[in-house]
Design a protein with these regions (language model features):
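Catalytic-core regions built around general acid/base machinery
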Residues: 1-12
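Asp-based, Mg2+/Mn2+-dependent phosphohydrolase catalytic module
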Residues: 7, 16-122
Length: 122
């Protein structure tokens, strides 16, 4: 479902990757997905790892957007939802495939089990 949903999103939105993964892994995954991302921010470039605000600030800078205009969509509650909220991202959508428990004080704007329901929350 990931490839299809990202292709659809790309028609109307800028899309970016914010990842702690190694560059070779990300390049492989991007090629497999087959979607042109507007930005790719890696920990190796930002010189820090999520959940560090440095990663998110690098994304904000590259997108040239105010945080309130950014929707952050992620699978990791710990690595993504807290920092996105602390930095004032406009919307935070948690893809909770495994029905994990998140921190209620950092409750996302939406919680979905897979990306097919993403359009309902944008």
């Amino acid at each position: 479902e990931v490839n299809q949903v990202l292709s659809e999103l790309k028609q109307d939105y800028k899309i970016a990757i914010l990842s702690n993964s190694e560059p070779d892994i990300i390049r492989f995954n991007i090629a497999k997905i087959g979607v042109a991302f507007d930005e790719v921010v890696l920990a190796s470039e930002a010189k820090c790892y999520k959940p560090s605000a440095g990663m998110f600030n690098e994304l904000i800078k590259r997108l040239n957007e105010c945080p309130k205009n950014i929707t952050h969509i992620a699978q990791s509650f710990y690595h993504d939802m807290r920092t996105a909220k602390d930095l004032g991202f406009g919307r935070r959508i948690w893809i909770n495939r495994y029905k994990k428990q998140g921190d209620l004080s950092y409750k996302p704007d939406a919680e979905i089990s897979d990306m097919r329901r993403l359009h309902e929350h944008l």
